[in-house]
């Protein structure tokens, strides 16, 4: 399944309720699973982004449903990128 990397930043609401971030990330897993998405990793980060999440989904529309659900809660803003494993990238670049 395609991999997606989601870069998140806390909104004012997310910063105000930062102590519950871990619980919200835990609740993301079953919500994503119900929509057919597997959460591979969540990391709280320092620097430009506050949270990095790696997920697998069947397609862009499926990941968009999860991201829309997350955004509707108002705690973060996101940027989503399609990621490739090293092996996927190797297959893409073999013909170059």
Located regions from the model:
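Short N-terminal micro-motifs specific to bacterial/archaeal maturation
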Residues: 19, 53-54, 80
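Short, well-ordered beta-strand segments in beta-rich or mixed alpha/beta enzyme
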Residues: 5-9, 43-66
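Short S/T/G/P-rich N-terminal loop/turn motif that feeds into the first structured element of a domain
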Residues: 1-34, 38, 46-49, 84, ...
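Generic structural signal for residues in well-ordered beta-strands
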Residues: 39-42, 78-80
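An amphipathic, aromatic/His-enriched active-site/gating alpha helix that lines ligand/cofactor pockets
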Residues: 57-84
């Amino acid at each position: 399944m395609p991999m997606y990397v989601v870069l998140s930043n806390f909104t004012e609401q997310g910063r105000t309720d930062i102590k519950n971030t871990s619980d919200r990330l835990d609740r993301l897993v079953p919500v994503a699973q119900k929509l057919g998405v597997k959460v591979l990793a969540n990391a709280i980060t320092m620097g430009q982004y506050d949270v990095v999440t790696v997920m697998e989904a069947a397609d862009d529309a499926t990941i968009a449903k999860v991201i829309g659900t997350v955004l509707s809660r108002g705690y973060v803003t996101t940027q989503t990128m399609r990621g490739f494993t090293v092996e996927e990238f190797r297959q893409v670049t073999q013909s170059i």
